[in-house]
């Protein structure tokens, strides 16, 4: 169980790093995900970045495009 929590936190840290690299606030990132037809809020972005909210595949694909990142970057340094 602790390993899963650590992985969620690591993915969340990567989400935050990629969002900041893209020059976006949490609100801006949420708005761009919404444009792709996926319900999203700043609070959900915050929860995902803290590892407190699960990320579904459609959100991950949207963030990949928005952040101009590779899938590998989302999973870097998993513990």
Give the ranges of each region predicted by the language model.
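Short alpha-helical DNA-recognition segment
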Residues: 23-47
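Residues in the recognition helix of alpha-helical DNA-binding motifs
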Residues: 18, 32, 48, 77
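DNA major-groove recognition helix of helix-turn-helix/homeodomain DNA-binding modules
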Residues: 56-73
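Residue-level recognition of specific faces of alpha-helices
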Residues: 14, 44-47, 59, 73
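A short, Lys/Arg-rich alpha-helix, primarily the initiator
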Residues: 1-22
């Amino acid at each position: 169980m602790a390993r899963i929590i650590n992985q969620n936190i690591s993915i969340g840290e990567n989400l935050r790093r990629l969002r900041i690299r893209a020059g976006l606030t949490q609100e801006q990132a949420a708005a761009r995900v919404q444009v792709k037809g996926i319900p999203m809020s700043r609070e959900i972005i915050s929860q995902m970045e803290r590892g407190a909210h699960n990320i579904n595949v459609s959100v991950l694909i949207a963030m990949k495009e928005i952040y101009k990142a590779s899938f590998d970057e989302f999973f870097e340094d998993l513990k």
